[in-house]
A protein has these predicted regions:
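Non-catalytic interaction/Regulatory regions outside core domains
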Residues: 1-128
Length: 128
């Protein structure tokens, strides 16, 4: 299965995730949904917040797809959660990649997070 197939089928195909992307740990984009362009610098900042120190997110927020999100919480070393009005996003780090998924107004944050986290668990179990 290709990286794009994971985005299209495993994430967007659930109807619980409105937009998604998968990046390498260097910030390079492997695949993304149409119009959801997370810059390598944004992915790298998210990775730094997950693996090192999320405190800059408290004051500055988190930039994803050139949109500023309010930092909600983190699971150190694993994930961050953020929102922008009635929308939000979750980013989960695996051994070799970063999954970013967003939900839109009318979608449930917990359902979106669960889908992203389950795919991350699958990647981790398979060495990614």
């Amino acid at each position: 299965m290709s990286w794009q197939s994971f985005v299209d089928e495993s994430l967007l195909g659930t109807s619980q995730v409105a937009r998604a992307s998968i990046h390498g740990l260097d910030g390079k984009r492997y695949a993304s949904s149409a119009g959801f362009v997370v810059l390598p610098s944004e992915a790298q900042a998210i990775l730094n917040g997950i693996t090192k120190d999320p405190s800059p997110f408290y004051a500055k927020g988190i930039a994803i797809n050139r949109t500023k999100y309010v930092f909600v919480r983190s699971d150190p070393g694993h994930a961050i959660y953020c929102r922008n009005g009635n929308e939000g996003a979750v980013a989960v780090k695996t051994n070799k990649c970063l999954l970013i998924g967003g939900y839109s107004e009318g979608m449930q944050a917990g359902c979106c997070s669960s889908v992203i986290e389950k795919l991350a668990d699958y990647f981790i179990a398979n060495g990614y």
